[in-house]
Each structure stands twice: as structure tokens, then as C-alpha cells.
């Protein structure tokens, strides 16, 4: 599943294709034909069930796919993962670049959603992760996926303040580096690893 086709969300897909056999791609917009990949649009209601994992698409609604071209971010595929027969982190909500409108609709459509890990919308932008959304979901952990020294300042100070006020721990790839959830001894745990790499500021 690609949440949408912005480069920072889909750019590595050709490399993934080289390493992992992909039977079908799911996204809110169809990829260029040169990628030669069976495709399906994502929309609310899609579900896939496996012995150890349930996957659901919670957003966008099928009727909203017509508006994706004008607002890719807001109509990102929002994915809900439920791992079964494991301890630790079990329920994951991955927001893509969706913002407040999607959050409001999710709370309306799924009032009893159980979340252990929330991957913040739009890298922790101030226009996502509304206070009421965070307060209702009450995740055990929030994740902000953002590039080091990114020009937007993600995750935003406003979102960081909301999380602190609600006592929701935050892990950020800016601070912790690569974040990986790993199954160990029937329990899903989080590992972080900062690569030994030279970072150049934008001034160079």
C-alpha cells in the first residue's frame, strides 16, 4: 500500500519491486504504466485477513476518489493494522499525509477504534493530529516519520505540545533515526537505530 504518490511516500517503490515480489499495488492514484504493476484504488471498507494480521483501509471513502487529484494528501490511504496472538504493540493506525478532515471523519465512522501506535499524519504537521483526535484515540505511542533537518520543521512544535499535554510518548525519525517494529518472542517491540552517516546542512 502506498498512501499516495508524493515522492516522499512512493519514491522508493521501484527499489522495493526489485527486492520483494509485489502481486498488487494499492494507492489513491494509479502509478505510471512503466512500473507494470497490477493496481487497485484504496478506499474505506477494504479488508484483508491473515492468520496473524488483519488489514483495513479506513480512508478515503470510495466517493472521494474523484477528488484525489486536487488533494492527494487529504485523501491518502489510511491503513489500520491489527496483529493477532502477540503481545506488545498490536494495533497500528498509519495516517499517510491525511489531516484534520480525515481525522474528523475517522472519529465519526470508527468511534471505538483501538490504537497502540499512531503514525502521525503528514509527518507531524501542525495541520494534522488535532487535539481531540489524539485525546480520543489515546495511543500508547506516536510516531513521526520525517527527514533530518527537514525544511518544514516536522514534527511541528504544536503537535509535540499536544502530545505532551496528553502524556502520549513520541518517537521521531528525526531524533531516533530508523524505527522498526519487530516480532520477538511473540511480542512486537520497537527498535531504533541511527545510521552512521554524514549529514550536510542545506547551507552547503
Label for each model-derived stretch:
Residues 1-204:
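Non-globular, low-confidence helical/coil segments that flank catalytic cores
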Amino acid at each position: 500500500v502506498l498512501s499516495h504518490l508524493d515522492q516522499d511516500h512512493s519514491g522508493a517503490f521501484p527499489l522495493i519491486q526489485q527486492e520483494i515480489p509485489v502481486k498488487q499495488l494499492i494507492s489513491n492514484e494509479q502509478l505510471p504504466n512503466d512500473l507494470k504493476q497490477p493496481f487497485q484504488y484504496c478506499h474505506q471498507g477494504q479488508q484483508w485477513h491473515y492468520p496473524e494480521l488483519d488489514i483495513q483501509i479506513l480512508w478515503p471513502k470510495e466517493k472521494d476518489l474523484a477528488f484525489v487529484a486536487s488533494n492527494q494528501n487529504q485523501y491518502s490511504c489510511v491503513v489500520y493494522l491489527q496483529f493477532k496472538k502477540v503481545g506488545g504493540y498490536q494495533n497500528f493506525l498509519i495516517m499517510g499525509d491525511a489531516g484534520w478532515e480525515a481525522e474528523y471523519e475517522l472519529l465519526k465512522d470508527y468511534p471505538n477504534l483501538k490504537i497502540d501506535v499512531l503514525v502521525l499524519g503528514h509527518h507531524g504537521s501542525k495541520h494534522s493530529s488535532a487535539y481531540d483526535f489524539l485525546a480520543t484515540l489515546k495511543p500508547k505511542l506516536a510516531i513521526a516519520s520525517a527527514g533530518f533537518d527537514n525544511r518544514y520543521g516536522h514534527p511541528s512544535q504544536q503537535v509535540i505540545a499536544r502530545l505532551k499535554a496528553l502524556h502520549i510518548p513520541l518517537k521521531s525519525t528525526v531524533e531516533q533515526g530508523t524505527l522498526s517494529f519487530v516480532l520477538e518472542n511473540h511480542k512486537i517491540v520497537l527498535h531504533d537505530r541511527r545510521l552512521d552517516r554524514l549529514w550536510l546542512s542545506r547551507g552547503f
